[in-house]
């Protein structure tokens, strides 16, 4: 029986052509993609792997189309690491999508299909999902898991604070913005809408962690320098932050 199982495992492992040297250098990539044998050339490839919708995937996508091979899109996992990727911290998870990618609104994605099929999933799967969500909230898990809790003396923890509105910024030029049907004007509209809809509230703008560490630019940094608008320019655990505001705006 063990021999048959080993043979079965060998048959389901496919040769995956990954043109990107950067992807191939991801630590423990073979563990994250156990169903693939990773190849740096296209000979004998049964699938092609690239990173999301970055322009650098053009070569990989063209090769997949030319040879009629499935293309697998990867992205950072939603619970990625214990530090920023731009600071060199390796991923502990990745998103794997054989249909599209979750932030692309122009086509379906595997995540979208899973969500649409939620009503038909086994009760055990739904229970496991609920358990995972509860675990995330209980332990304040996030994408990078490096930021401290909101401090006890932070104004957002004050029991006498006014209604509080949080606006979420993003890194400039992020693929999720472009393929999510948004641009810089969308962020400006969101910002002005938040101000207009909440005239008596304190407005807080949360800067993206990659902007805080100086690696990237944001959309709202300059807009945030206005009356009754506060810029959260420090690392804060996102769940800790969300638990201390009344309303959230995001693109």
For each predicted feature, which ranges?
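Catalytic donor nucleotide-activated moiety binding site of glycosyltransferases and closely related
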Residues: 191-233
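Functional cation/ligand-contacting sites centered on basic and imidazole/sulfhydryl donors
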Residues: 21-22, 168-171, 182, 201-207
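N-terminal pre-catalytic "stem/leader" segment of glycosyltransferase-like enzymes
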Residues: 6-61, 172-174
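Well-ordered, non-membrane alpha-helical segments in soluble/globular domains
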Residues: 57-58, 182-193
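Short, well-ordered alpha-helix to beta-strand connector turns
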Residues: 44-47, 68, 244-246
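A donor-sugar binding/catalytic signature common to diverse glycosyltransferases
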Residues: 50-62, 75, 234-251
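A nucleotide-sugar donor-handling region in carbohydrate enzymes
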Residues: 83-180
């Amino acid at each position: 029986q063990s021999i048959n199982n080993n043979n079965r495992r060998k048959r389901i492992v496919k040769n995956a052509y990954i043109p990107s040297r950067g992807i191939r250098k991801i630590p423990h990539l073979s563990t994250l993609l156990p169903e693939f044998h990773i190849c740096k050339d296209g000979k004998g490839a049964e699938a092609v792997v690239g990173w999301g919708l970055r322009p650098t995937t053009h070569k990989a996508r063209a090769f997949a189309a030319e040879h009629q091979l499935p293309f697998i899109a990867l992205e950072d996992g939603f619970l990625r690491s214990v530090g920023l990727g731009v600071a060199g911290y390796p991923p502990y998870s990745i998103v794997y999508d054989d249909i599209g990618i979750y932030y692309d609104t122009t086509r379906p994605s595997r995540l979208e299909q899973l969500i649409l099929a939620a009503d038909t999933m086994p009760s055990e799967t739904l229970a496991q999902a609920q358990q995972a969500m509860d675990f995330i909230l209980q332990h304040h898990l996030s994408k990078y898991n490096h930021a401290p809790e909101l401090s006890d003396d932070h104004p957002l923890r004050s029991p006498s604070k006014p209604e509080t509105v949080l606006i979420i910024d993003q890194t400039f030029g992020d693929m999720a913005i472009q393929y999510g049907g948004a641009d810089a004007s969308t962020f400006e509209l969101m910002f002005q809408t938040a101000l207009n809809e909440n005239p008596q509230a304190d407005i807080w703008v949360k800067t993206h962690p990659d902007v805080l560490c100086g690696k990237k630019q944001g959309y709202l940094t300059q807009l945030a320098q206005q009356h009754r608008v506060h810029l959260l320019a420090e690392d804060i655990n996102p769940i800790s932050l969300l638990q201390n505001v009344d309303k959230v705006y995001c693109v």
